[in-house]
From Swiss-Prot:
A biological-process GO annotation: mRNA 3'-end processing by stem-loop binding and cleavage
Description of post-translational modifications: Phosphorylated on Thr-60 during mitosis.
Swiss-Prot/TrEMBL keywords: Cytoplasm, mRNA processing, Nucleus, Phosphoprotein, RNA-binding
Gene: slbp1
Lineage of the species this protein comes from: Eukaryota, Metazoa, Chordata, Craniata, Vertebrata
Organism: Xenopus laevis
Short sequence motif Nuclear localization signal NLS2: positions: 95-98
Protein name per Swiss-Prot or TrEMBL: Histone RNA hairpin-binding protein
Amino acid sequence: MSDHWRTISEEHRPHAPSRWSQGRKRCSDGKLRRHDDTDSTVFDTKPSEEPQARPDSFTTPESHKPVARCKDWGSAVEEDEQLREKVDQDIARYRRKLLINEFGRRERRSSSGSSDSKDSSTHGEMETDPAVITRRQKQINYGKNTIAYDRYIKAVPRHLREPNVHPRTPNKFKKYSRRSWDQQIRLWRIALHQWDPPAAEGSDLQPFMEEDMVCTETSSQENLFTGTPTKVRKVEADDAFDLEPCFIEEELLS
């Protein structure tokens, strides 16, 4: 009889928490754990009920146009293949353009009776590595996907652009060193900042002044197509310190 009552009392008696859950009053998600939850451990994970606050589209730092996100790995591969096909088409088109120009120059030389050596100009080598051209195209696309470039092409049409006055996209097909190309891209993007939208009130952004930067290309006949553009800052001669008043004051004191 006593064993029967002991069994009933043990069934209704609350079980003590397991050895692995002693002293743990909260679950892994921070919520209070129930008293009858004996199997819960810190390794239990529950999916978050709140969805990730991640936008469906993103823009480049200076762009107002939404760019579709890459949904999966297949989309990234397809986009890369499309870029390669476009690069191959651009290379073929540029080669045809060079051949047409060369044929036109030969026709003009033959009609005028001049020799080839008289009109021999140094032409730069053509970049034929698809990987290099693809990398350059990505850098150009990044610079063109900005508000400043959109404002520039609207304000200055192609037929009104002048050399050494308006920014010109570097030629991705010419043979440049990596350092020279990166410098040209950087200076091109700096020049595009002239068409940035006006800064809003309270913003820390400073307007880009054309007087602060002068872009020049230092090149020689030997490295005509491998020269590195340099950045030269203007120095106003009017701000030079005048020593003449100091000499006059020294003579008066002596």
